[in-house]
């Protein structure tokens, strides 16, 4: 962690054709004779012709090929829809807390698709990179933190390149994820802060430039409502311009003021971004489980569940 200064079985009717042959004779016990021949034995010549037609030298090669195809289909059928899983969870939570009031993230109007695109900001937009190269690592870090110290609704960090590389390797392979954020639940019978609910947030990475990467956070409810035009409540920018010279990466983030996501909420989401994307390593059992859950989500594997996501996000173990 760096220090902050703000996605069936076929019923196989096996009829072994074990139709017993009754040789009935007066005064004798029926003898059951079972006849069973596998398709391969019965149609070996046809199977061999089919195998050769498909470019295989033997029936065994054909069987191995079909086995791989069948296993691939089974994996496809077993895939889950992660967003459907999340939707089911939200509906379940809503029903359980039907009489409760959640302090959920406010939904906003979608982005205007016709609006001109604003060029993304690079490190040079904030500091003169040319001049930074002549300064020591400590001086550069001080300048970066000072640049954001007096600004509201901001986050900033200086990240060791080794930590950044671990996180980016997972981000490039898994650019989309979801993370839970604890939310206060206030019911008619419960005092404020007595109960907690969970609100899910959509995490998306964008590699906008050779040395600039964005991580955007949007409530899942808003993403489902507006899709690609949903407004992120928090945007993190990573600048890797000084990796070779100083061995560090700068991060700055902005939390939109017109939502009820505050800087502390964004910090908690950022902490779990680091943990699930492997920034803290994958040495411990819990750390391995987090990164594996991220990969399960990307692969739409049944291994991903919202319950496991919440449990691992709340665990104090790293």
Curated annotation (Swiss-Prot):
It is found in: Mitochondrion. Keywords: Mitochondrion, Phosphoprotein, Transit peptide. Residues 1-40 form a transit peptide. One of its GO terms (molecular function) is unfolded protein binding. GO terms for biological process: mitochondrial proton-transporting ATP synthase complex assembly; mitochondrion organization. The modification Phosphoserine is found at residue 109. GO terms for cellular component: mitochondrial matrix; mitochondrion. InterPro entries: ATP11 (IPR010591). It comes from the Eukaryota. Essential for the assembly of the mitochondrial F1-F0 complex. May interact with the alpha and/or beta subunits of F1-ATPase. Present with 2840 molecules/cell in log phase SD medium. Belongs to the ATP11 family. This is Protein ATP11, mitochondrial. It comes from Saccharomyces cerevisiae (strain ATCC 204508 / S288c) (Baker's yeast).
